Curated annotation (Swiss-Prot):
The keyword Ribosomal protein is assigned to this record: no
Family: Belongs to the CobB/CbiA family.
Organism taxonomic ancestry: Bacteria, Bacillati, Cyanobacteriota, Cyanophyceae, Synechococcales
SUPFAM superfamilies: Class I glutamine amidotransferase-like (SSF52317), P-loop containing nucleoside triphosphate hydrolases (SSF52540)
More about this protein: The a and c carboxylates of cobyrinate are activated for nucleophilic attack via formation of a phosphorylated intermediate by ATP. CbiA catalyzes first the amidation of the c-carboxylate, and then that of the a-carboxylate.
Pathway noted in the entry: Cofactor biosynthesis; adenosylcobalamin biosynthesis; cob(II)yrinate a,c-diamide from sirohydrochlorin (anaerobic route): step 10/10
Cited Gene3D superfamilies: 3.40.50.880, P-loop containing nucleotide triphosphate hydrolases
Molecular function in Gene Ontology: ATP binding; cobyrinic acid a,c-diamide synthase activity
Protein's name in the database: Cobyrinate a,c-diamide synthase
EC number: 6.3.5.11
Gene Ontology biological-process entries: cobalamin biosynthetic process
Chain ranges of the GATase cobBQ-type domain: 248-441
C-alpha cells in the first residue's frame, strides 16, 4: 500500500520515526525505497545511509505534479516496501495554482492516493490529543489517516490516558515512543547535522531499529508499507532520450559540498555527462580532462579554513575557469566561488575569488520557494526562461550583481521582487537550489556549454578526445535503483 509518515507540525518526530522504521526493515534484510516530501537535502542522507539506496525527493513545486507521480512509480518498481516521510505539518504548503497547501504532505497524499500514518507529539497532552487527531483526520476530504504513532509519551500512566482519549475515534495506535528514550539527533543552523559528520551513526541506527522492533505494531504496520502492485511502470523517469556519455563533469562531493538531489545526478548521466566526484577539501588536483564543474550546496562555512588552505586545487580550478571552464555553483558553491568567506566567529578565509563579492555568515534565515526568471543575456540559459527553486541559507553577499542572473520572488503577496545570482565569464552561481526533473532544458544547455569548452581545448591541443564508454540505463539505475 505504502504510507506517508506525517505529523501535526515540524518537530513532532516524523524523521526519528521514519528512520526507526527504515532501520528496522534494513536489519530484517527487507528492501525498501524511501522518499522525502519537499526540498530537504539532509533527511534523505539519513534515509540513504540506512537503506543503501538513494532517497528521492517528491516536490511538485520544484518539479510538477506529473513528475512526482512518475518519480514515485518509477523508483518504487522492484522493491517490496516503500515509505514516504512528510514535511512540516500535514497541511503545511504554499499557495499555488489554486491550492493553499501546494507541495504539502497532504498534497502528495492526494496526488499518489496514499494513506497517512500520523505522528502525534504527546508532550503536555492527554485528553486533548483526541481533538487534535480528529481535527486532522477530517479537515480535508481525500486525506486518509489509517493510524497514529504516539511520540514522547511520558510513561505507562500517560499512555493509558492517551488510549482512553483516542478509543472513541477507533483509529489504530500503530506505535508508542516514550520520552525517556533519547533518540534525538544533533542539529545546527540549517537543520540536522549530516550523517557523514556523525561517527557514531551506525550505533544510533541500531538503537532506532531496536526501539522500533519493540515499540511499533509490525503485524499491522508492515502490510501498510508494501509497494502497491498495480502501479504504472514507466520505462524511464525522464521524457528525453538517453544520450551516450559526451562530457566529463567534475562534481564536488565531500563534507563541505553534499547537497545534491539523486534525480539530478541521474539526469546529468542520462543527458550525456560522465560524473567524476572530487573533494575541494582533500584533493590537491582536479580530475583530468574535465569539461565542466558542478559545485553544489552544503556547509563550506564549517570547513572554510581547510577549503582556503587547499591552494593547489584552488589555483588549478581558477586557471581552468579563466580558460572558460563552465562552472555552476548553488549556494555553498557560490560561497566557494566568492572572494572570501567570513564564518560565524568572524574569521575571514580567502576562497576562489572568481566572483566580485564576499560572503558573510549570520543574519536572518533566507528560506522558501522562489519563482525565477533568467535576465542575464550572457547566461547559458535562454533569457526570460522561467525556473522554480528554493533558498535555504544563513549568509549574505557583501555586494550584489549589477546584472543579476535571476529576477525572482516568493509565492506570497508580501514577498518582494529580488535579484540573485552571478554570471561572470564561464561561471554561473546563485543561492537558488534547482531540481531539474521538470526543467531538463537547463541540463541540456549546460551540456552544450561543456561540449563547446571541450571542442575549444581539443582544437588547441590541450584536451584529449573524449573516449565514449558503453551506454548504460539511467533515470535511476546509475545511482542505486536495482
Amino acid at each position: 500500500m505504502t504510507v506517508i509518515i506525517a505529523g501535526e507540525r515540524s518537530g513532532a518526530g516524523k524523521t526519528t520515526i521514519t528512520l526507526a522504521m527504515l532501520a528496522y526493515l534494513a536489519r530484517q534484510k527487507l528492501r525498501v525505497q524511501s522518499f522525502k516530501v519537499g526540498p530537504d537535502y539532509i533527511d534523505p542522507m539519513f534515509h540513504s545511509q540506512i537503506t543503501g539506496r538513494p532517497c528521492r525527493n517528491l516536490d511538485p513545486f520544484l518539479t510538477s505534479e506529473a513528475y512526482v507521480q512518475r518519480c514515485f512509480h518509477y523508483h518504487s518498481q522492484g522493491t517490496p516496501y516503500s515509505l514516504i516521510e512528510g514535511v512540516m505539518g500535514l497541511f503545511d504548503g504554499v499557495p499555488y495554482q489554486g491550492l493553499t497547501d501546494y507541495s504539502s504532505t497532504a498534497h502528495i497524499a492526494r496526488l499518489l492516493n496514499l494513506p497517512i500514518v500520523f505522528v502525534m507529539d504527546c508532550q503536555r497532552l492527554s485528553g486533548s490529543v483526541a481533538a487534535i487527531v480528529q481535527g486532522y483526520r477530517h479537515w480535508q476530504p481525500g486525506v486518509n489517516l489509517v493510524g497514529v504513532i504516539l511520540n514522547r509519551v511520558g510513561g505507562d500512566r500517560h499512555l493509558e490516558l492517551l488510549k482512553i482519549a483516542l478509543e472513541p475515534l477507533r483509529i489504530p495506535i500503530l506505535g508508542v515512543f516514550f520520552r525517556q528514550q533519547d533518540l534525538t539527533l544533533p542539529d545546527r543552523h540549517l537543520g540536522l547535522v549530516p550523517c557523514g559528520e556523525l561517527p557514531q551513526i551506525q550505533q544510533y541506527f541500531d538503537q532506532l531499529a531496536h526501539v522500533a522492533a519493540q515499540q511499533l505494531d509490525w503485524p499491522k504496520l508492515l502490510p501498510l508499507l508494501e509497494t502497491p502492485r498495480n502501479l504504472p511502470s514507466p520505462m524511464s523517469l525522464f521524457d528525453v532520450p538517453q544520450k551516450s556519455p559526451q562530457a566529463r563533469l567534475a562534481i564536488a562531493q565531500d563534507q563541505a559540498f553534499n547537497f545534491y538531489y539523486a534525480d539530478n545526478l541521474d539526469l546529468l548521466t542520462h543527458c550525456g555527462f560522465e560524473l567524476i566526484p572530487f573533494s575541494p577539501l582533500e584533493d590537491t588536483e582536479l580530475p583530468p580532462a574535465i569539461d565542466g564543474v558542478y559545485l553544489g550546496g552544503g556547509f563550506p562555512e564549517l570547513f572554510a579554513e581547510q577549503l582556503s588552505q587547499n591552494q593547489a586545487l584552488k589555483d588549478q580550478l581558477k586557471t581552468l575557469i579563466h580558460q572558460g571552464l563552465p562552472t555552476y555553483g548553488e549556494c555553498g558553491g557560490l560561497m566557494y566561488l566568492s572572494q572570501s568567506l567570513t564564518n560565524f566567529e568572524g574569521q575571514i578565509f580567502p576562497m576562489l575569488e572568481m566572483l566580485p563579492t564576499a560572503v558573510t555568515m549570520g543574519g536572518k534565515l533566507s528560506l522558501g520557494y522562489r519563482q525565477a526568471q533568467v535576465v542575464n543575456s550572457h547566461s547559458w540559459l535562454w533569457q526570460t526562461e522561467s525556473l522554480r527553486g528554493h533558498e535555504f541559507h544563513r549568509s549574505q553577499m557583501t555586494k550584489l550583481p549589477n546584472q543579476a542572473l535571476y529576477r525572482q520572488r516568493g509565492l506570497l503577496a508580501i514577498d518582494q521582487n529580488t535579484t540573485d545570482g552571478w554570471c561572470v565569464g564561464s561561471v554561473q552561481a546563485s543561492y537558488l537550489h534547482l531540481h531539474w526533473g521538470s526543467q531538463i532544458s537547463t541540463v541540456e544547455k549546460f551540456r552544450a556549454a561543456c561540449l563547446a569548452f571541450q571542442k575549444k581545448l581539443s582544437y588547441l591541443g590541450k584536451h584529449p578526445p573524449f573516449k565514449s564508454v558503453p551506454l548504460r540505463n539511467t533515470g535511476g539505475d546509475a545511482h542505486g535503483r536495482e
